[in-house]
Amino acid sequence: MATSQQFLNPTLFKSLASSNKNSCTLCPSPFLQLKSASTIFNYKPLTSSSATIITRVAASSSDSGESITRETFHGLCFVLKDNIDTDQIIPAEYGTLIPSIPEDREKLGSFALNGLPKFYNERFVVPGEMKSKYSVIIGGDNFGCGSSREHAPVCLGAAGAKAVVAESYARIFFRNCVATGEIFPLESEVRICDECKTGDVVTIEHKEDGSSLLINHTTRKEYKLKPLGDAGPVIDAGGIFAYARKAGMIPSA
């Protein structure tokens, strides 16, 4: 190795050899100093022993730490079947819209569920309108399948929907719902999409034990929904970043 260094730069090699001839001590560089591995970070867990949780409004507008019960959703439902993919929820051509820009977010809402097959006679958002009259979406199996697209839950929330109740979800769509905090992805214990019709009046009640109940006032039937678990408080806070700020995991903006 020394021979190759001397061959490449003999002058530099002689200079280094002379200066280090009588010393083999290396001078530590201040840039190589590492922080102690014993540092302990006091992060707060995602779960809470409290029966009440922070609502999205409280999380976004107040730092007082006030906790109130999760709101109840009431309105008309829009019924879909199995395998509703993200291209049907929001076609890829609208992927250039930026949700953080108010005008773009409004446009995303107007295009929500614009890619549905033609056999769905009703439109989720009437052409020319920016909001939907349906506040609850009821789906079948594998809702939100296809490509990973944060615009999918964002457009539903921007259109005015509060919750999706489906038999099951594609994992990536469920996680995007939690991460963005745009809409509640609730899971039914039975196949509700076969028993409800678009336009039925429904209510989703959230109980203190974490479970939820869907009441169809049109058919006078009730359906128990599965608990959201640790994902619930994150959605209530308005998404993963809002929750992390509220919990003290990251600095407030």
Curated annotation (Swiss-Prot):
Kindly give the Gene3D superfamilies that the UniProt entry links to this protein. Answer: Aconitase, domain 4
Q: Which residues cross the membrane?
A: none
**Transit sequence range:** 1-56
UniProt main location, coarse: plastid
One MF term in GO for this entry? 3-isopropylmalate dehydratase activity
Plastid recorded as keyword: yes
Which InterPro entries did the record assign? Aconitase/3IPM_dehydase_swvl (IPR015928), AconitaseA/IPMdHydase_ssu_swvl (IPR000573), LeuD (IPR050075)
Q: Where does this protein act, in terms of pathway? A: Amino-acid biosynthesis; L-leucine biosynthesis; L-leucine from 3-methyl-2-oxobutanoate: step 2/4
What family classification does the UniProt entry report for this protein? Belongs to the LeuD family.
Protein name as annotated = 3-isopropylmalate dehydratase small subunit 3
This protein's species is Arabidopsis thaliana (Mouse-ear cress)
High-level lineage:
Eukaryota, Viridiplantae, Streptophyta, Embryophyta, Tracheophyta
Gene that this sequence comes from: SSU3
